[in-house]
Amino acid sequence: MKTLVLLSALVLLAFQVQADPIQNTDEETKTEEQPGEDDQAVSVSFGDPEGSSLQEESLRDLVCYCRKRGCKGRERMNGTCRKGHLLYTMCCR
């Protein structure tokens, strides 16, 4: 059940990322990495009003980042992110 909720949240997050307007500027089309460009934070929360087993600390404060070059430290790869025509790795901790 937890896996289903997590996957549903990730799918909704992917749709939200794709719904953002596409901005084609020279900065986005550069292949050079800019400082901080790969650290786009996304916060995902789980639970219902009455509380449930989904209120565990590990699922309540899931923080994800869209990174160019893979996950760092304690992060785990949880899919992909898209910004415009560029594809990033979604890393969550």
Curated annotation (Swiss-Prot):
S-S pairs: 64-92, 66-81, 71-91
Entry comment describing in which tissues the protein is expressed: Paneth cells of the small bowel.
Keyword Hydrolase among UniProt keywords: no
One Pfam family named in its UniProt record: Defensin_propep
Keywords, comma-separated and alphabetical: Antibiotic, Antimicrobial, Defensin, Disulfide bond, Secreted, Signal
Subcellular location: Secreted
SUPFAM superfamilies recorded: Defensin-like (SSF57392)
GO cellular component terms given for this protein: extracellular space
Family: Belongs to the alpha-defensin family.
Full protein name: Alpha-defensin 10
Native source species: Mus musculus (Mouse)
